[in-house]
Amino acid sequence: MASAFRSSTRLILVLGILILCSVSSVRSWSKEGHILTCRIAQNLLEAGPAHVVENLLPDYVKGDLSALCVWPDQIRHWYKYRWTSHLHYIDTPDQACSYEYSRDCHDQHGLKDMCVDGAIQNFTSQLQHYGEGTSDRRYNMTEALLFLSHFMGDIHQPMHVGFTSDEGGNTIDLRWYKHKSNLHHVWDREIILTALKENYDKNLDLLQEDLEKNITNGLWHDDLSSWTECNDLIACPHKYASESIKLACKWGYKGVKSGETLSEEYFNTRLPIVMKRIVQGGVRLAMILNRVFSDDHAIAGVAAT
């Protein structure tokens, strides 16, 4: 799989931003979900890793990782990046409610490692070699950073590790309050957008502030050590995927039938799960970046650019 993870030029990266608002929603957290995950992660970076991340980002985003966290969704259908379209999710056997890497991490042709878990492993491995690259290293590592940041959001969205037959809920059509949607989109965006509208006056900054307060001294403070426990950076995404399929079974699929209307009861009971997974994605992304960019080689890589 590593040979497939190719690099691009700055031009391609810029063009990805230009089409940011023109691509329809696909299998991924909403724009807001990814922005929150990346903002939370960047705010938890130590000084050295934060400097490396800022150095890898193109100048026009002014050091803001969240400005590019949706980029992998925007380019997934381009010919050059079509191979990445299967890296955003994992299809598991219907009703198994479990995840096994050897069984489930492959694309529709059976090519191994082509899933969001395999992608996180690959891009983490690339970033671990940041201080050892050639003169064009910056472009390779920029893409690796953006893909890793995005996929860490995706793997924490429970319906991204869903059942094969319904494509993670994409084919379960229903209504969200008064408009048409599907179960996957409910978890990708509907719950987040409803929370923003009803609780935060559509202000993403207020929602972010609320989430971060619960990290520092609130609801999740005592959970941080267990969330970031990881003896092997390459293997830890297995755990994140397993968490997601269990949540998909318990909270996503449970009690839902095609054609029905989901509204207040579903929103109120599932909102805490969605918020927690967004935060876990950010906390764990920060953990990975702090570890891969913490050594002298990584800092030397910044000085060399």
UniProtKB/Swiss-Prot annotation:
Optimum pH is 8 with RNA, ssDNA and dsDNA as substrates. SUPFAM superfamilies: Phospholipase C/P1 nuclease. Endonuclease that can use RNA, single-stranded and double-stranded DNA as substrates. Hydrolyzes single-stranded DNA and RNA without apparent specificity for bases during senescence. Endonuclease that recognizes and cleaves all types of mismatches with high efficiency, including heteroduplex double-stranded DNA. Maybe involved in programmed cell death (PCD) and senescence. Belongs to the nuclease type I family. Its cofactor is Mn(2+); Ca(2+). Disulfide bonds join C38-C69, C97-C249, C105-C115, C230-C236. The record marks D73, R76 as: Important for catalytic activity. This is Endonuclease 1. CDD domains: S1-P1_nuclease. A divalent metal cation 1 binds at D73, H88, H150, D154. Residues 1-28 form the signal peptide. Residues 287-305 form a propeptide. Glycans are attached at N122, N140, N214. Induction: Directly induced by NAC92 during senescence onset. Binds 3 divalent metal cations. Uses Ca(2+) ions with ssDNA as substrate. Can also use Mn(2+) with lower efficiency with ssDNA and dsDNA as substrates. The gene is ENDO1. Transmembrane segments: none annotated. The lineage of its organism: Eukaryota, Viridiplantae, Streptophyta, Embryophyta, Tracheophyta. Substrate binds at residues 29-34, 73-79, 88-91, 98-103, 122, 139. Pfam families: S1-P1_nuclease (PF02265). It comes from Arabidopsis thaliana. Keywords: Calcium, Disulfide bond, Endonuclease, Glycoprotein, Hydrolase, Manganese, Metal-binding, Nuclease, Signal. A divalent metal cation 3 binds at W29, H34, D154.
